[in-house]
């Protein structure tokens, strides 16, 4: 599903996380499974993979059984082909019967400051998106990294002096999104509209599974964060994102195409290739500002919170629905792996359901 940041620009959401709700924390430490070797800035690989267009079915639904209750889970993927249309009939049928529709796991970092005071904090959040003391990226980054950044910025963004004053994680994410767009890919806009449409028609609301974390001193936290200088994790985030933009977009497109076509074999083979936004989130979670406020252990807390919501849905409703990233469904350490010991069966979209098979055999046997 698309990321929601309460109306505040996603471009500085990582820096202003303390003032922005509903930041998804899953896959926070994910990295591309095969690191891409740095290349000469002039040797940027053009896309070799054709991004699909038109109508496509998506990967299907995972089924989690507990007794006669079923939780259906749609695996999400970002980015996806920009010009595809998702054939969502199967999901719409399940949503029409679901007693509850769970939102994706995540964390909502907020405070009891009220809407008006929250609006007055937006300038502080925007300042937190910039480098301390007005520094520019050419002053902060190693020379070789800045050379790569500059070449890719010229290619995908053009002349934009303002971006040079933004923190590395934010600046490189804007570059990443521009590169995706130029290559027929996008983040969001495929799955969420379908869910919203069905929920609106049924008069239902999405049931959030986000962990609520309160910050007593958001303004002070933003002030502290603004003072924090460049850390090794910040440079690693930028460097790895440049690797993807320079050499890894064909693999990104292959995974996007696989989701669209429902090619589970390719999705399994490429499991672990995490969202670049989520990969860079880990650099924020390692800041002193985050550690002092207990935000550095969010991954385990968010997972436990989602598992509790899934347990409740399975206990209370014959049919329920949720979304998780494909990585969390396929990985051995993901949310689905943690849920497996708590339920009777977990079935992938390409796995037969024993109950359905028995029913089908009974019908065949009764047919003269």
Could you say what each language-model-derived stretch is?
Residues 10-12, 195, 335:
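Generic structural signal for hydrophobic residues
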Residues 32-294:
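Structured, acidic catalytic/metal-binding patches in enzyme active sites
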Residues 19-22, 365:
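Intrinsic disorder/low-complexity segments, especially N-terminal tails and targeting/processing regions
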Residues 23-30:
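Boundary at the C-terminal end of the N-terminal hydrophobic targeting segment
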Residues 288-368:
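A cross-kingdom marker for long, charged
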Residues 9-19:
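Bacterial N-terminal signal peptides
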Residues 1-10:
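Bacterial N-terminal signal peptides that target proteins for export
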Residues 10-12, 65-67, 314-316:
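Short hydrophobic "helix-edge" motifs at membrane interfaces and signal-peptide entry regions
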């Amino acid at each position: 599903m698309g990321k929601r940041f309460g109306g505040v620009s996603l471009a500085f959401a990582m820096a202003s996380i303390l003032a922005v709700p509903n930041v998804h924390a899953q896959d926070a430490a994910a990295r591309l499974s095969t690191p891409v070797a740095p290349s000469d800035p002039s040797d940027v690989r053009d896309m070799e993979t054709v991004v699909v267009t038109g109508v496509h079915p998506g990967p299907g639904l995972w089924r989690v059984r507990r007794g006669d209750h079923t939780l259906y889970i749609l695996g999400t993927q970002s980015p996806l082909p920009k010009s595809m249309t998702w054939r969502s009939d199967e999901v719409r049928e399940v949503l029409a019967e679901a007693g509850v529709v769970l939102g994706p796991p995540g964390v909502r970092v907020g405070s009891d400051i009220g809407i008006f005071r929250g609006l007055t904090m937006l300038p502080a959040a925007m300042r937190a998106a910039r480098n301390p003391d007005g520094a520019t990226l050419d002053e902060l980054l190693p020379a070789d990294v800045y050379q790569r950044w500059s070449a890719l910025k010229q290619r995908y963004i053009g002349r934009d002096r303002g971006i040079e004053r933004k923190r590395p994680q934010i600046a490189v994410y804007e570059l990443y999104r521009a590169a995706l767009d130029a290559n027929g890919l996008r983040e969001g806009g495929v799955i969420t509209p379908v869910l919203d449409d069905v929920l609106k028609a049924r008069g239902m609301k999405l049931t959030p599974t986000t962990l609520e974390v309160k910050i007593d001193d958001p303004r002070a936290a933003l002030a502290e964060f603004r003072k924090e200088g460049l850390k090794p994790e910040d440079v690693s985030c930028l460097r790895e994102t440049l690797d993807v933009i320079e050499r890894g977009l064909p693999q990104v497109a292959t995974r996007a195409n696989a989701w669209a076509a429902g090619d589970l074999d390719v999705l399994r083979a490429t499991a672990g290739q995490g969202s670049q936004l989520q990969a860079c989130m880990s650099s924020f979670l390692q800041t002193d500002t985050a550690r002092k406020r207990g935000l550095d252990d969010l991954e385990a807390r968010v997972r436990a919170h989602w598992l509790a919501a899934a347990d409740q849905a399975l206990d209370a409703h014959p049919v329920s629905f949720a979304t998780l990233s494909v990585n969390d469904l396929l990985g051995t350490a993901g949310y689905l792996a943690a849920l497996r010991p708590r339920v009777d069966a977990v079935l992938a979209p390409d796995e037969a359901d024993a109950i359905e098979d028995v029913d089908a055999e009974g019908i065949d046997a009764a047919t003269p």
